[in-house]
């Protein structure tokens, strides 16, 4: 199975507001960068979409080390919260409805396809690839051509 590193980030101008995601995929000296902006969304949705879109780039099952500065994404997966929410019909332990269910339903099958290790990195702390993802996400917002985030609540 191929092994690669993925770095992801999401950004939002206002929350909700215009948002974007950026991702960098690194495999044996090769590099792929992806990004997109959206009209009205949230920072957490952009963080999730960065992970989803990066994993969707992979054409076969892979071992992935995924670096994200999103505690929401990393903790939801590594601490198992999302699996509990799904088991309870997308209800959190505090009895409130889980957010971003449409994106979790896209992400979970990708996590079954690939062997993904999530690693949290501190944002804006001189991690070169995380900073590049932030540039991509912010650049996608600034570039215009913003898409509609259909699942934004």
Model-identified regions with their sequence ranges:
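RNase H catalytic domain
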Residues: 8-18, 52-132, 136, 141
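RNase H-like nuclease fold core
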Residues: 1-45, 49, 53-62, 77, ...
